[in-house]
Amino acid sequence: MIGKQFIEEYLTLQLVQHLFHHRHDRIFTEKDNPDNPDILIMQNKRDVFVIEVKSSKVHAKVLGEASAEGFREFLEQSLASEKKGPGEKNKGIYQLRKQINALKEKGRGYRIFPVIIYTESSLDMPGVNSFLDEKFDHIIDEDRGSF
C-alpha cells in the first residue's frame, strides 16, 4: 500500500499536475470516481490520456535465475490479467480496456492515449514493450479505432 500511495497518489499525480496545468486540462483519479483509472487526463475535451500506474516488483528469484517463463508470468499477472471472479481486479491492459470502453460509450469522438507507468526497472529490457503491445493489440482489437 505504501508503494501505491507514494507512487500513484503522490509522485505520479504531482508530476501530471505540473505537466497538465492549462485551464482546459482536467485531471481525474480513482478518488474522484472509483471507476476511473489511476489517472485520467482530459485535454481540450477531445484528447484523453488513460493512465495506469504499476508499482509491482519482479521477485528476486525470477531475476536471479534469469527465468524467462517466470518473467513472462510476472508480466501477464501484473500487466495483462483479467479478473476471473468477485474480489479480483483487472490488471494493466484490461484496466485500460475498461476505461476505453467507458469513454467510447459516451460517444464523443475522443482521441484516447492509453499509458502504463511502471516502477520495475527490469521492464526496461528489450522485448517487454513488444510483448505488451502484442497482448494489448489482441485484447483491444475491436476498439483500436478509438486511438
PLM feature segments, named:
Residues 4, 8, 32-33, 44, ...:
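Active-site-proximal structural scaffolding
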